[in-house]
Amino acid sequence: MGALQWLSITAAAASAVSALTPEQMIGAPRRTEVIPNPSGDTGLFSTSQWSFDTHSESTWWSLIDLQSGKTTTLTDDSDIEEIIWLGSDNSTLLYINSTNAQVPGGVELWIADSSDFANAYKAASLSAGFLGIKSTVTDSGDVHFILRGKSYPNGTAYNDQLAETYPSTARIYDSIFVRHWDTYLTTASHAVFSGTLQSSTSDDGNVQYTSSGGLTNLVNPVKGAESPFPPFGGNDDYDLSPDGKWVTFKSKAPELPLANNTAAYVYLVPHDGSATAFAVNGPDSPATPEGVEGESNNPVFSPDSDKIAYFQMATNTYESDRNVLYVYSIADDTITPLAKDWDRSPSSVTWVDGDNLVVASQDLGRTRLFAIPGDAGDDFKPTNFTDGGSVSAQYVLSNSTLLVTSSAFWTSWSVYTASPDEGVINTLASANEIDPELSGLSSSDFEEFYFDGNWTTLQGWITYPQDFDSSKKYPLAFLIHGGPEDAWADEWNLKWHSKVFADQGYVVVQPNPTGSTGFGQQLTDAIQLNWTGAAYDDLTKAWQYVHDTYDFIDTDNGVAAGPSFGAFMITWIQGDDFGRKFKALVSHDGPFIGDAWVETDELWFVEHEFNGTFWQARDAFHNTDPSGPSRVLAYSTPQLVIHSDKDYRIPVANGIGLFNTLQERGVPSRFLNFPDEDHWVTGQENSLVWYQQVLGWINRYSGVGGSNPDAIALEDTVNPVVDLNP
């Protein structure tokens, strides 16, 4: 595998630049963040790749030399779930094997050497499924570790394969959530468990590790707590102190109704569970900053194990409030904000040393790294030391530089070193220079632009097609992002990759209107009660700016598409004169009937957006209802409606209702449904069909289908079309 990986570099360099197709983009290798060993000379990562020939996925683990960038394959064992550096030296690894010979549904912990992986040995057998392992070697030589899994109400680990079944399929609820994202809730919850691997030295001097005792559920003793919290909770929700004595985790406020509140606390607990976890910033903690009641996230221990850095929002019920960086001192039981007035909302934090930190934050359509000293005052304004692309992970190397994993519009994976003093130091690898599927992609295919919106200057992105010629005209593909508190950013986007759209023969425009994130909290906050006001006006002004500025963009044959909030906007556009500016529309998982918001899972979202429940703020719900009779009577632009059955954020009835309405109005329309997908389409085979239908639909009406012989057509999808029309 390793030799083939490096042969691909030559192939990529030698191949001609070709259009990026859905098959190429979806089937290209997908790599994880690179995790360095203790000395910082070797990194570890995994790669997965889907084959449309075999309809299966291959996964392998690799090592990368952090000086030369050269990679070698460590293992392609498909049973391996995760691998981490154990921390005892620079070559010992700890991994989770996803099978257990003795316990169906259980997993095993194995120890291996990176130079002799085949001779790994089993260190522990675990009775249930677990993920997200973190470990440290203590002063005694033993390994303390934590991982996450499901828990029964009594605190024991939940095993899906051994769980009790009932004669009836009935589900009974006395509280909400009933369902969340893509899952109906059960009595099982998520928890962080701790354990120990005891060290011993064999006769030949080799250190061996074996399980010492069982696992301890650190979350369950706190009534109502859950960590990580689904659906997006993960490894960032908990941490193990470097000395192995403490564990910190995040949980939603257990005393508040889950579906109506975003409040969450950071907890601290001894690794052995000898005391019950307590919320360091909960309502009963004297250290809690006054008026700070929103979500907490990303707790991380300092290198000396004495402090915890974390983020918290001020406002409960507002999921897109500004994250502020705080540091909790274990010894002093105090909480200190850092750069409190900084007008950005950082999303991850890393300790460079005991006094200085680095955070990643959205910033002007990218995710950049910023340095923050431990004594930063409220008015400290961090300066970015990375620029283009979007950082997904950062680790401190032994020389205090950072190992960064990122992506961009033009590369799915980039690895480099950087520091606050020097910026980007050395690029080690980039997927567009490794993978034949991505060869020819470059930053020159993308650029940003600024335009005057409803009340402020706004930013957007332009993506150019293959062999772009400014003397020619290309139909506009106008993409509207979801959220609404989100942004089109310089990052690899599997679900809505602008270059895949562009290489059909479009110039793609992606504006960031009111509500977008990364441009200051005022712009984000301004979306409340303003979906069809400033945000809608921003989109019309973005279209007008493009129409007036770029001669090579054909707005007469333009198309528009968007997911979620973007899909709402598409249907709102359909009911307005602006809808006649487009030849075709595509809406993915969008709301249709205002009152149907009562069916959503996270009620805090809609009740914040519209400033009340659907009975308290009925006018606000109706003011953003694209199904109003006067709007429906204007529907006339061909529209593809996409909605999946497991979307519990915006249930599928919204999509069916919209499609029914379009059909009864006689508007050319099609309904695309995935019974096994949620608010996103992530399955590789489903994603291919999604792109075929979306691109086929817009190509049919924009003229691209006639001008580009290689353009995707609706007929490229092999699934049958149900058409019951006489």
Curated annotation (Swiss-Prot):
Cellular component, GO annotation: extracellular region
Cystine bridges: none
Gene Ontology biological process terms, A to Z: proteolysis
Catalytic residues, chain numbering: 564 (charge relay system), 647 (charge relay system), 679 (charge relay system)
Alphabetical list of Gene3D superfamilies matching this protein: alpha/beta hydrolase, TolB, C-terminal domain
This protein's record includes keyword Ligase: no
Glycosylation: residue positions: 90, 97, 154, 260, 384, 399, 454, 530, 611
Keywords: Aminopeptidase, Glycoprotein, Hydrolase, Protease, Secreted, Serine protease, Signal
Pfam families: Peptidase_S9
Subcellular location: Secreted
GO molecular function, one term: serine-type endopeptidase activity
Annotated signal sequence range: 1-19
Known EC number: 3.4.14.-
Function text: Extracellular dipeptidyl-peptidase which removes N-terminal dipeptides sequentially from polypeptides having unsubstituted N-termini.
Family affiliation: Belongs to the peptidase S9C family.
Record's protein name: Probable dipeptidyl-peptidase 5
